[in-house]
Amino acid sequence: MMKKIYKAHILFTKEKDRFEVYENGYVAVGDDGRVVGVASNLDDLKVQCSKFNVQSAEIVDFGDKLLIPAMNDMHVHAPQVHNQGVAMDLELLPWLQNYTFPEESKYADVEYAERMYRRFMHTQWLFGTMRSVVFGTVHTASTRRLMQLYQEAGMGALVGKVAMNRNCPEALCEDVEAAIEGNEQLIAEFGDRDGLVRPIITPRFVPSCTPELLKACGELANKYQLPVQSHLSENVSEIAWVAELEPESKSYGDAYNRYGLFGQTPTIMAHCVWTQGAELELMKRNGVMVAHCPTSNFNLSSGMAPIRSLLDEGVRIGLGSDISGGHDLNMFRMLVYAIQVSKMHYQLNHDKAFLNLSEIFWIATKSAGSFFGKVGSFEPGYEFDALVIDDAVLYPAEYSLLHRLERFIYVGDDRQIVHRFCRGQEVPEPKVF
């Protein structure tokens, strides 16, 4: 890959409390796909990138367009795309039994799975999501195909073959040995630690995993030093159920921790709507990341996650669409919904300020991106995951660059995203079929 310099209006967040803004700025990207430097003019870029040889790089001028970090979806169920926007009048547990599990059972058919996965990934591409933390299904072959499709597309993903062996339909229930064997196959095939697409250990949630399966998942994560994803404290009835199933655990989070699934390797837990007390302290101590899924939490009547409080406590946070509990794959909408949830919290407790735009943008980009490594910023050494936004149709002339970005986040859509990059490579439109 040839080293390049991109010229545009560049905006990103090194820190959560402010934007870095370079009007008509330049960002240099090395042949390894990483940012070498960012500056307001070429002379400053030359000083900053003394070893880069600016003169030999191709300069790509995006004119009056915005250049921002790409989006990261930190919690999404790819096999639920067919149910997107359906059964939104149910709470979590009946929604799982009546809609989600029957749909996921269809993924035993790899042809059906590929058709749905292509549709899912194309939508992600449209909305500028270049990295994802993804639930597959229990089916090894279908999960393998999903990982292959991400590789073919040039989009980054941590993809999990789901582990579950209780409180689920027979078609989705597999014994411990089969669950581990399927994961071992995928680890062998996609185990490159520097690969864009890698496995992530994925016990669905405590109610669907016996202690034996949870223990095996923890051992697998430790053996291969793989990340872990699951769900935590999403719904009050779910929390009560976990307390019945795991009476020796001090909290829902402790139920994972006892089996080596709560920060012993990099861990992300979706929702955490009701996380508090000892569970919160354990999460902070172990460095567990929260995937905040505002649309899903509203749709399934789960509650409002206290993201301002978690942020102030130093908890790592990213945003997730949680399709199909959530109804929208546009991650820019998640920024808006997360701010709105924060404002609802503010109405209940004026001691906590609601989230502002720089904070939520930082959460969605640099904070979320840290789960993949150095992703989500244009600081030197970061992988160049980026979007080019042509907001001319939104009449930008009267606005500052920050207001242009804010306006795009609130009222723009995929039609304004004209270029997408992942690890320095431009990502072409993936085939639907």
Feature locations, PLM:
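Metal-coordinating catalytic core of metallo-dependent amide/deamination hydrolases
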Residues: 141-273
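Divalent metal-coordination and catalytic microenvironments
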Residues: 9, 27, 33, 64, ...
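N-terminal metal-binding scaffold of metallo-dependent hydrolase/deaminase domains
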Residues: 1-49
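His/Asp/Glu-enriched, well-ordered alpha-helical/loop segment
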Residues: 258-264, 308-393
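Alpha-helical scaffold segments that flank or form the walls of functional sites
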Residues: 66, 84-155, 179-193
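C-terminal cap of metal-dependent C-N hydrolases
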Residues: 15, 383-433
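Active-site gating loops and adjacent loop-to-helix segments of metal-dependent hydrolytic enzymes
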Residues: 82-113, 161-176, 235-264, 289, ...
